[in-house]
Amino acid sequence: MMKWVFALFFLLIFDVDVSAQVDPHFSQYYAYALWMNPALAGATQMDYRATLIHRNQNFGNVNTFSTSGLSAEMTTNQNINIGLNVLSQTATSGGYGYLNGALSLAYTGVKLGYNEDYNITFGMTVGFLNRRFDPSRFQLGDQYEPGVGFTPLLPSADNFNNAASTVLDAGAGIAFFDTNPLKRANFYAAFSMNHLTQPEDPFVDSQGKLRLPVRYLVNAGVSLKLGNDMVLIPHVLYARQGNAQERMAGLYLTIPYGETSELIAGGNIRFKDAIVPYAGFTFNNFTLGMSYDINPALRSSGTSTNTFEISLTFFKRKSGNYRGVRCPVF
């Protein structure tokens, strides 16, 4: 199984046409698993987990994008895991807003192999998608006075009859885990489709209605057990939404210290976009992760860009002999 992950890794490296994402995204995407795939709800070595993640993007001295996510998930004894997810993004200092909330259910009853080491989970998510903008923050052509410039008190003849929209949103996914505790390498992979309802763009006046494209996402990785209880996890992600696509590959290492603590260090590459080093630590029931996007293309052109991301996860570990594959958790 592991050879397929490395094959996909090299495919990502040599085929790197990347466009801007339609949906918001995170560099620490595994800290916010429900954003990727509802089948990942509860797919951890934990009874429950709650994560708060925040991403701040600045270009020059302008605060361009601010994105926050909150998720909570729990396992049950009925082969059903439950998750709740909320994502919010504001752009241009609050001029545009994107809010997505959803409830996820994952069925975990498919277990294959002699010892039921191969687990397949199916997930679905249903929620809402709200998009809005604030017309008062626009600078319109008829609000400019010759010799004066932009005059915000000058009324505009442009009318905005539809400044907000809330619609039904839905998605589905599937995930595979090799949970054999005797193996040195455990493989996992997942596939999801989001925005299956393809809601119309509420702000574009067009004869042919524009719709939000379905987002297809594939992620995979291998949990490699090293000596002294260290774990190395290479992982990849590919997302496509309309003509936009994102390819990421990375790895990270966990180094235990004490009984309930570990250090985390690694990095991602978002091809033709950014290099993302990150670090974190786990202490008792908390994990803190931090990352910083370095964009070589913008820096070489003299444009100042700063993208910082931080995540905080609270969890309760599973008791007993739980056989779960170690997935990236920042």
What are these regions (language model features)?
Residues 21-330:
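Subset of outer-membrane beta-barrel
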